[in-house]
Amino acid sequence: YIVKDIEKLADTIREAFQIAQSGRKGPVLVDITKDVTAAKTYFESMEPAVIHPVCETIKEKSVKEAIEMIEAAKQPYVLLGGGCTLSDASEQVREFVKKIDAPVCDTLMGKGVFPGEDPAYTGMLGMHGTKTSNIGVSQSDLLIAIGTRFSDRVYGNAKTFASRAKIIQIDIDPAEVNKNILIDTAIIGDVKAVLTILNRRLSQQQHEAWMQEIQDMKAKYPMTYHQERLSGPGLIEKI
């Protein structure tokens, strides 16, 4: 948006906030000219903007494909992104992870959705991620990406990322599918709504050998720091 008339400023800001909070939430640019910022006008308060709910168009075919892939997997991995936070889907995520018995990694925007003290959690993925998460995803046969846009800091080299795995992407925005990483199937819809369906229809999975392999990897590659000098983690630990 660009606002050149002070009389249009209030309506434009209102519309921008409405768009920012509807569907896939995100920033909206409003460019206001200098003369408008210095101008004066009469403002009449309005009712709060209506936030449009997400139109649920979750396709049955996509759900069936995802369930078949999950139940056929031997070494699944779950990747959580910011969409899980925006959807307030922490409870559904925890139930899903328990149901499919898989390790979990996340992006920076997805941190806090899944409890960090849970044995299934392996830390962040990608450039700033843990060795366990990066190796684990590279060895997985199914990656379930939930509410993440696959930024380059997560996947690194697109040609070699999760090269052994089939990929399921769950996202509210169809424009994010196959944008950075080619996937095998996608479920378009709100994360909480999609996971609620999957949790209800999936059978309980067991991957004891795979989960033990991940635990061994976490023990082999722990998150450590130099204790002989002052560091952020050391200070937090002392506090």
Residue ranges and their predicted role:
Residues 1-46, 69, 134-168, 236-237:
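Structural signature of the thiamine diphosphate
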Residues 37, 110-115, 151-152, 174-178, ...:
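Short gly/pro/ser/thr-enriched loop/turn and capping motifs at secondary-structure boundaries
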Residues 84-168:
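Glycine-rich, anion-gripping cofactor-binding loops and their flanking helix/strand elements
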Residues 13-14, 90-91, 180:
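Conserved strand-to-helix beginnings and helix N-cap segments that scaffold or border functional pockets
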Residues 1, 51-57, 117-129, 180-193:
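Short beta-strand elements at the ligand-binding edges of bilobed clamshell
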Residues 7-8, 31-119, 211-239:
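Cofactor-pocket helix-loop regions in the catalytic cores of large enzyme subunits
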Residues 7, 164-239:
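Phosphate/pyrophosphate-binding active-site segments
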